[in-house]
């Protein structure tokens, strides 16, 4: 059975999970002391100073930086990835991991079984023969057929992107390991994404996210100086690592997004590939626009799932009528998952703007309170708009009968897409 068919079977068998119902949101403002305390409380993630953050665009900036740091690893490498598929970058990374493994570095690799289940045995063997420990998160097997009530666990995936070298350097973002992520994101065959390289105290929390998933998968707790060294100040950026694991009843990234939107005074700029806001998020966005906040949303002109794209577009109407500007990126598939609020507060990570990310997947986001980084991301947003098409309410309202029918088919399962 194809892996997509597995998930459809799971959905039909066990039903769906949804985020918690938020009936009231506190009136906080970005930058005020109570804003930071409120964000920390609802995301269970401390906001920590002393970090160095480098924003990396697309594969042509991200993969060379990752490979450079991997090849310089001295003690440990931990790597968690949702999507790892055959191709030149997949082979190059596998060889780099294996080379470090042969040099005595401890290499722990965790791949999601749904997103990476089709990776070739050749690539896995390359890593294992180099001494790497390779595991698959929630391996899909025949157990769910024999015991159907156990199917539910397969619907909860690890969508996190984590790379930590020597416990001191970290990477996260929206990237996958595929040749689709190579290039500059301006041609159809090269997806557009945004990632980050991290040094400083925040790396410990990135490593903790990996340790959580590794423990669940293997029963092994990683630790010690090699994985969690003492981390000194590396820069002047303040931020947090927000991880969510909804199977534990937590929806931290949902609350991060919701509180950030509600706290905006001047501007909100959202870039996301899978955009299906619930009623609470939609209301928060429309209310922001109503109080004079400029709200711009950049979405893909096409994505790798037609039914998801159709379901996403069905949400445009209330937002457009509420005074929100929506754009669709045309140069390639837009896969970046970022938000910038008031030019000072920004987040980069794996979290899509949909129920699957908020309620079903393990996710991870880097959030920063830094004017320099936030303004860099606003400039990136402006550059992306040059390759995008604005969507008016009239254009959206005149969509074809076929699209409207597809929306009807997508509606019952949109919270699982």
Task: Please give the residue ranges for each predicted region.
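Charged, low-complexity intrinsically disordered terminal segments
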Residues: 4-5, 15-417
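Hydrophobic helical h-region of N-terminal Sec-dependent signal peptides
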Residues: 8-12
């Amino acid at each position: 059975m194809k892996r997509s068919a597995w998930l459809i079977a799971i959905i039909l068998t066990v039903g769906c999970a949804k985020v918690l119902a938020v009936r009231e949101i506190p009136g906080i403002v970005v930058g005020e002391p109570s804003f930071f305390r409120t964000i920390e409380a609802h995301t269970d993630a401390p906001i920590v100073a002393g970090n160095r953050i480098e924003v990396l665009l697309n594969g042509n900036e991200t993969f060379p930086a990752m490979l450079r740091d991997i090849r310089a690893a001295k003690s440990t490498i931990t790597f968690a990835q949702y999507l790892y598929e055959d191709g030149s970058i997949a082979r190059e990374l596998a060889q780099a991991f294996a080379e470090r493994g042969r040099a005595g570095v401890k290499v722990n690799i965790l791949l999601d079984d749904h997103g990476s289940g089709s990776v070739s045995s050749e690539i896995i063997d390359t890593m294992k023969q180099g001494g790497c420990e390779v595991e698959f998160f929630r391996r899909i097997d025949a157990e769910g057929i024999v015991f159907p009530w156990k199917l539910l666990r397969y619907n909860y995936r690890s969508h996190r992107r984590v790379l930590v070298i020597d416990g001191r350097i970290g990477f996260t973002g929206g990237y996958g390991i595929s040749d689709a992520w190579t290039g500059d994101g301006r041609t159809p065959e090269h997806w557009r994404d945004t990632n980050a390289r991290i040094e400083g105290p925040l790396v410990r929390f990135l490593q903790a996210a990996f340790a959580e998933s590794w423990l669940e998968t293997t029963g092994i707790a990683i630790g010690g100086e090699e994985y969690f060294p003492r981390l000194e100040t590396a820069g002047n950026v303040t931020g947090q690592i927000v991880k969510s694991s909804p199977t534990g009843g937590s929806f931290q990234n949902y609350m991060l997004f919701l509180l950030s939107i509600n706290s905006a005074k001047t501007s909100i700029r959202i870039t996301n590939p899978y955009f299906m806001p619930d009623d609470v998020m939609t209301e928060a966005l429309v209310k922001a626009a109503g109080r004079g906040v400029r709200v711009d949303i950049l979405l893909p002109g096409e994505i790798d799932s037609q039914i998801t794209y159709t379901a996403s577009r069905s949400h445009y109407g209330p937002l457009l009528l509420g005074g929100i500007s929506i754009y669709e990126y045309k140069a390639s598939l837009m896969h970046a998952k970022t938000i910038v609020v008031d030019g000072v507060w920004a987040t980069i990570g794996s979290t899509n703007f949909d129920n699957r990310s908020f309620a079903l997947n393990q996710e991870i986001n880097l959030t920063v309170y830094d004017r320099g980084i936030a303004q860099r991301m606003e400039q990136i947003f402006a550059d992306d708009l040059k390759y995008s098409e604005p969507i008016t309410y009239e254009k959206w309202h005149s969509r074809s009968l076929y699209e409207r029918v597809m929306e009807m088919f997508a509606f019952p399962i949109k919270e699982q897409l």
